[in-house]
C-alpha cells in the first residue's frame, strides 16, 4: 500500500538521521551498521546496534523511535498498538504538537510526525493525518528526496481518500518535477550520510527501478483523481500511460474498468474485470486489500447501472461473503483483547469493507422493491456513517415503502387497478356489497415501545428525516466542506488503499465546495439542494401518515419554496399541501393547490450540467450512480399528473357540497386517460356522486363493472328532483391514496 511503503522508507531514513556533526565516529559507525541491517531485513542485528547506541547516548529520543520501528518490522508489522504508544510518548517527551511547527527547527522531528501520520492513515483518521502531512510538506525543502517523495505520496493518497482530487493532482505535478530533477534535486545534508551506507549493490539500477515504480504510481493516482473529477478526456490519456507502465496488472485493469463504467461501456467494464488475474495479487495480508471482494463489488455496481438489480444483489452478497471470510482470518490472529490493532499486519486495518458493502446492498435492495431487507442492511451501515444525510433519507424510504404495501405495479411505475368490492354478504333481499377500503391510513405502529427503536415504522421514518434535515448545512449557498469523506470499495478506488472508509466524525478542512457523505461520494451544492427537496417531500408524506397535518403543511410549503425544485416534487408538494389543508378544514386553500395548471412538468429535474459534472453520480455509491436511470413512478406524464389533480379536486368540491363541479372534474379527468387507467378511488367518487344524486342503479352498475359508465354524464340534467333523501347526508369518500405517490 502507498502508506505502508512510506512507513518502511521513513524508518530507514531515520536510522541515518542521527548522523550529525556532533556525534563520534563510533556512533556514526553504529548508526550506519544499524541502517544497513534494517535495510537488509536483519532486524535482530539492527536492534543490537541500536542498543549499543542507546548505551552511548541515552538522551536521544530518535534512537528510541528507531528501536520501536525496528521492533515493529521484526514482528512483521503486527504490533501497531506498541508503536502507536511509543510515538505518543515521544511526542509528549519532545513537547511538540503539530500545530506548533513553525520553523525549520522542527525538521528534526519530521520522522516522528511522519510515522504518526502513517499510523493515523491506517486507523482511518484521515483528517488528522492530513493535518500532520501538510505541516510536513511546508518544510519539505531540507528533506532528502526519497523521504520527500514518501511525504508527498502519503498526502496524495489522503487527498484522494477525502475527495480532494484537485489538491492531489497539484501534488502529483510537484512529484513529477521532483522525480525528473533526479537524485540531486532535493538532497540535503542528511542524504550524504545515507548514501554512504548504500554503496553496496548497483545503485544506478536500483535508482532507475525506483523511478519507474514512482512514475507508474503517479499515473495511477492521476487516473483516480480524474475519475473523481469526472474528467474523462484527461483520464483517457492517463489510462494509456498506466497500461504502458503497469501492463495488465490487476490495479491497471480495475482502473480501466472504472473508466469504461463511467463512460457507460458496461459490458467492456465487465470484460476488463474478468480479464484481471486476481491470483497474481500478493494477498490482503501483504497489501491490506481483498481483491476478490473488490471484484464482486465492482460487478455489483456495474450490473446496477445496467438495471440488472437482482444480479447486482447477488454480486454484493458474494463480496460480503469474501469480506467476512477475510475478517474471520484476521480476527483469528488477535490474542490480546486490550490491543485491538495488534496481532495482524498494520495494512490489514484497512481491509474490512463490511459497512460499505452493506450500504451498497441496502440501496440495491431498496431499488428492487425489498424495503425490509434493505432496512436491515442500512440500519447497520448507519451506525458507522451516521453523519450521512443521504443514508438517513434512504432509511426513511425503506420505512415508507415497507408500510405502504407497494404493489408490483406501483414498483414498476404503473397505476394499480384494485377492485372496489371486497366481498358480498347475505342473500336475496339482505344481500349486501362490502366495499374495499381504498384508504391507506396508517395504523398505530407504536405498540408500547419507543419510536426511536430502529424498526421499519413510519414513526422511525420521521426520526430519520429529522436527522437528515439537521445534517444539511444551514446555508446551502455556501455549504461547509467537511473533508474526510471516504469512498466505499467501489469502482473509484479499485486496487489502491483508497478502498478504506473514513469515519463519520470529520471536521471542516479546506474549500467550501462539498460536505462528506461517506461511504458515497460527497454532496456538492446542487446535490444538496436536490437532497433537501427529497427530504422535505418525504417528511410531508410521513407527517400526513402520522396525522400531523400542521407539520405536513409546513414541510410541503417549504418544499414549494425551494428555488430549484423538480417538476415531480413540485407536483407532490401541491398534493401533500392540499391533503393537509383539507384535514385542517381549509378547503378553499386546498383547491388552490389542486389546480391542474400547477402541473407543468413531472420530470426528475436533473439537469444535463449536473450529469456531466457527476454531482449525483458517486463512483462509489452504486445505487446513486445516475439520476437519469432512476425508475419513474406513476404518474409518468403531465397528463397523468393532471388527472390525479382533477380527481382530488373533485373530492375537495364534494366536501363543499359542490357536486356539479366535482362531476365536471371527474368527467374531465376520465376523458384524459384510458378507461382501464381510472383508479378505484375515482370510481368510488363517481359512485358517491350518483348516490348523492339519487341514482342508485347506476351506482350499482359502476360497482359491478368496476369502471366509470358513459351514462353518468346525463344524470345531472335528468335528476332534478330528489326521489330519495337520506336522513343523514352521505359523507364524501376520502381519497388519501392519490396523495401517497412517492418518487425515489
From Swiss-Prot:
Residues 496-506 have a biased composition (Low complexity). Residues 1-26, 182-203, 475-521, 602-634 are annotated as: Disordered. The keyword Nucleotide-binding does not apply. Residues 1-16 have a biased composition (Basic and acidic residues). Residues 484-495, 602-612 have a biased composition (Polar residues). Residues 73-107 form a coiled coil. It is found in: Cytoplasm; Nucleus. It comes from the Eukaryota. This is CCR4-NOT transcription complex subunit 10. It comes from Mus musculus.
Amino acid at each position: 500500500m502507498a502508506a505502508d511503503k512510506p512507513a518502511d522508507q521513513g524508518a530507514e531514513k531515520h536510522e541515518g538521521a542521527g548522523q550529525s556533526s556532533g556525534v563520534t565516529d563510533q556512533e556514526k559507525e553504529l548508526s550506519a551498521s544499524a541502517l544497513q541491517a534494517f535495510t537488509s531485513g536483519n532486524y535482530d542485528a539492527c536492534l543490537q546496534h541500536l542498543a549499543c547506541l542507546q548505551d552511548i547516548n541515552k538522551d536521544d529520543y530518535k534512537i528510541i523511535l528507531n528501536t520501536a520501528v525496528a521492533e515493529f518490522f521484526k514482528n512483521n508489522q503486527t504490533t501497531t498498538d506498541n508503536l502507536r504508544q511509543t510515538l505518543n510518548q515521544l511526542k509528549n517527551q519532545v513537547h511538540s504538537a503539530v500545530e506548533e511547527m513553525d520553523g525549520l527547527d522542527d525538521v528534526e522531528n519530521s520522522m516522528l510526525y511522519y510515522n504518526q501520520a502513517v499510523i493515523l492513515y491506517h486507523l482511518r483518521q484521515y483528517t488528522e493525518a492530513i493535518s500532520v502531512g501538510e505541516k510536513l510538506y511546508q518544510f519539505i525543502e531540507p528533506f532528502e528526496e526519497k523521504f520527500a517523495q514518501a511525504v508527498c505520496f502519503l498526502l496524495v493518497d489522503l487527498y484522494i481518500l477525502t475527495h480532494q482530487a484537485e489538491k492531489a493532482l497539484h501534488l502529483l505535478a510537484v512529484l513529477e518535477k521532483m522525480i525528473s530533477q533526479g537524485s540531486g534535486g532535493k538532497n540535503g545534508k542528511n542524504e550524504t550520510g545515507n548514501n554512504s551506507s548504500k554503496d553496496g549493490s548497483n545503485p544506478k539500477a536500483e535508482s532507475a527501478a525506483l523511478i519507474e515504480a514512482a512514475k507508474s504510481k503517479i499515473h495511477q493516482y492521476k487516473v483516480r483523481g480524474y475519475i473523481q473529477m469526472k474528467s474523462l478526456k484527461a483520464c483517457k490519456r492517463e489510462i494509456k500511460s498506466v497500461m504502458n507502465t503497469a501492463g495488465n496488472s490487476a490495479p491497471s485493469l480495475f482502473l480501466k474498468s472504472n473508466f469504461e463504467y463511467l463512460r457507460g461501456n458496461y459490458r467492456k467494464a465487465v470484460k476488463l474485470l474478468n480479464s484481471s488475474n486476481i491470483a497474481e495479487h500478493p494477498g490482503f495480508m501483504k497489501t491490506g486489500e481483498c481483491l476478490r471482494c473488490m471484484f464482486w463489488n465492482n460487478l455489483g455496481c456495474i450490473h446496477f447501472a445496467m438495471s440488472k438489480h437482482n444480479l447486482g444483489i447477488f454480486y454484493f452478497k458474494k463480496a460480503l461473503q469474501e469480506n467476512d471470510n477475510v475478517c474471520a482470518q484476521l480476527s483469528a490472529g488477535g490474542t490480546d483483547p486490550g490491543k485491538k490493532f495488534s496481532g495482524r499486519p498494520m495494512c490489514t486495518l484497512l481491509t474490512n469493507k463490511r459497512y460499505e458493502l452493506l450500504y451498497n446492498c441496502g440501496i440495491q435492495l431498496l431499488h428492487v422493491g425489498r424495503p425490509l431487507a434493505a432496512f436491515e442492511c442500512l440500519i447497520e451501515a448507519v451506525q458507522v456513517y451516521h453523519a450521512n444525510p443521504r443514508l438517513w433519507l434512504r432509511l426513511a424510504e425503506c420505512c415508507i415503502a415497507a408500510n405502504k404495501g407497494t404493489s408490483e405495479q406501483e414498483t414498476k411505475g404503473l397505476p394499480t387497478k384494485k377492485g372496489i368490492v371486497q366481498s358480498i354478504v347475505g342473500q336475496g333481499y339482505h344481500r349486501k356489497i362490502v366495499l374495499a377500503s381504498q384508504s391507506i391510513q396508517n395504523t398505530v405502529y407504536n405498540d408500547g415501545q419507543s419510536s426511536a427503536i430502529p424498526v421499519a415504522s413510519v414513526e422511525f421514518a420521521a426520526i430519520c428525516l429529522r436527522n437528515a434535515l439537521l445534517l444539511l448545512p444551514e446555508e446551502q449557498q455556501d455549504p461547509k466542506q467537511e473533508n474526510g469523506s471516504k469512498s466505499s470499495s467501489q469502482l473509484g478506488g479499485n486496487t489502491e488503499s483508497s478502498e478504506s472508509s473514513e469515519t463519520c466524525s470529520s471536521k471542516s478542512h479546506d474549500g467550501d465546495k462539498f460536505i462528506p457523505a461517506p461511504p458515497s461520494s460527497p454532496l456538492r451544492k446542487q446535490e444538496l439542494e436536490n437532497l433537501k427537496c427529497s427530504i422535505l417531500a418525504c417528511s410531508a408524506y410521513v407527517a400526513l401518515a402520522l396525522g400531523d397535518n400542521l407539520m405536513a403543511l409546513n414541510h410541503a410549503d417549504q418544499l414549494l419554496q425551494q428555488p430549484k425544485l423538480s417538476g415531480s416534487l413540485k407536483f407532490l408538494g401541491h398534493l401533500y399541501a392540499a391533503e393537509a389543508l383539507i384535514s385542517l378544514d381549509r378547503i378553499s386553500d386546498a383547491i388552490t393547490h389542486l389546480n391542474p395548471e400547477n402541473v407543468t412538468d413531472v420530470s426528475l429535474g436533473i439537469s444535463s450540467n449536473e450529469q456531466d459534472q457527476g454531482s449525483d453520480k458517486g463512483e462509489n455509491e452504486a445505487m446513486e450512480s445516475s439520476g437519469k436511470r432512476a425508475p419513474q413512478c406513476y404518474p409518468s406524464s403531465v397528463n397523468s399528473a393532471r388527472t390525479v389533480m382533477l380527481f382530488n379536486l373533485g373530492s375537495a368540491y364534494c366536501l363543499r357540497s359542490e357536486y356539479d363541479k366535482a362531476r365536471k372534474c371527474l368527467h374531465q379527468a376520465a376523458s384524459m386517460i384510458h378507461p382501464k387507467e381510472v383508479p378505484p378511488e375515482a370510481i368510488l367518487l363517481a359512485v358517491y356522486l350518483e348516490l348523492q344524486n339519487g341514482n342508485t342503479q347506476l351506482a350499482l352498475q359502476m360497482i359491478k363493472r368496476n369502471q366509470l359508465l358513459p351514462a353518468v354524464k346525463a344524470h345531472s340534467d335528468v335528476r332534478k328532483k330528489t326521489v330519495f333523501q337520506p336522513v343523514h347526508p352521505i359523507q364524501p369518500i376520502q381519497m388519501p391514496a392519490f396523495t401517497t405517490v412517492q418518487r425515489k
